[in-house]
Every structure is written in structure tokens, then in C-alpha cells.
């Protein structure tokens, strides 16, 4: 009986460690993927960059994307 309880306890510990490790290594967002203000969800070589959208001078919201660090994007007119 003690061996059965010990085995069950060991299995529970192993499963919880595996789940914790998987959560720590969650997938990051690739370049040009939509992100939030949190910088932690983009991959390490990227940063979550946000800009305000507008149409005919009327604000339409905010968009955020994972972009390369230290790169400036401009719109050609």
C-alpha cells in the first residue's frame, strides 16, 4: 500500500514538473505577428512595436506587431 502511494506521489510530481517546464518554454511570436503591449510574448530578437491607425484623420485604433529591434519602419508616399 505504501509503495502504491509513493508511486502515485512520484508520478504527480513528475507530471507537474513537466507542465511547469512547458509553461516556461511557451512559444514566442514570430516576426510580423500581432502582439500585445507585453514585450515578453515576442521572440528574443524582436520587440512589440505599436502604432496608431487613422483614416482621414479619424483615429481607428492601435495595432501592435513583433518587429526587429532597432529598425525604423516608414511609409513611402
Curated annotation (Swiss-Prot):
It comes from the Eukaryota. This is U9-lycotoxin-Ls1a. Keywords: Disulfide bond, Secreted, Signal, Toxin. Coiled coil: none annotated. InterPro entries: Spider_toxin_CSTX_knottin. Contains 4 disulfide bonds. Its main location: secreted. Pfam families: Toxin_35 (PF10530). Belongs to the neurotoxin 19 (CSTX) family. 08 (U8-Lctx) subfamily. Residues 21-26 form a propeptide. Expressed by the venom gland. It is found in: Secreted. One of its GO terms (cellular component) is extracellular region. One of its GO terms (molecular function) is toxin activity. The lineage of its organism: Eukaryota, Metazoa, Ecdysozoa, Arthropoda, Chelicerata. Residues 1-20 form the signal peptide. It comes from Lycosa singoriensis.
